């Protein structure tokens, strides 16, 4: 779970793991190549039209679980949506994009730490996270 995002990042519940996740895996396994990409919004629309309960944030958590547990190898995402890639350049670009996002988040973390540590307060303690 991620602090301050508890309801969005909590572990999958039984319904999500046993019912939704297999459906999502089955659907995404047909999305081979960028031209077959499907957006989070579209996946949620399809599932809710079939009376499944899903939110965009919980779908992202399901997809996180699928990736983290190697349930559908090389499932990547772009602004076009999610798809399985067998293209080496796409996979390298996706890994590079993830690294750039990590660096961006770390930069903001360091900026917030610096701002906190530099605030005018005599009784403050410095943050070293």
Model features per residue range: what roles?
Residues 112-129:
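Exposed, interaction-prone assembly regions rather than primary DNA-binding/catalytic cores
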Residues 28-39:
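Short capping segments at the starts of secondary-structure elements
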Residues 53-68:
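Short amphipathic alpha-helical interaction segments
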Residues 89-112:
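Short, amphipathic alpha-helical interaction segments positioned at domain boundaries
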Residues 67-77:
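A short, conserved structural fragment
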Residues 1-30:
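Short alpha-helical segments that sit at the start of domains
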Residues 78-86:
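Minor-groove-contacting beta-hairpin "wing" of winged helix-turn-helix DNA-binding domains
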């Amino acid at each position: 779970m991620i602090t301050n995002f508890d309801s969005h990042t909590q572990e999958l519940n039984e319904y999500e793991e046993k019912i939704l996740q297999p459906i999502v895996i089955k659907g995404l396994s047909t999305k081979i190549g960028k031209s077959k990409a499907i957006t989070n919004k579209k996946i949620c629309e399809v599932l809710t039209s079939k009376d499944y309960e899903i939110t965009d944030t919980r779908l992202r958590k399901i997809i996180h679980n699928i990736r983290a547990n190697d349930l559908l190898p090389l499932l990547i995402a772009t602004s076009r949506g999610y798809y399985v890639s067998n293209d080496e350049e796409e996979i390298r670009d996706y890994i590079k994009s993830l690294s750039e996002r990590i660096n961006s988040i770390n930069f903001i973390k360091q900026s917030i730490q610096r701002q906190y540590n530099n605030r005018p307060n005599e009784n403050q303690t410095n943050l070293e996270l």
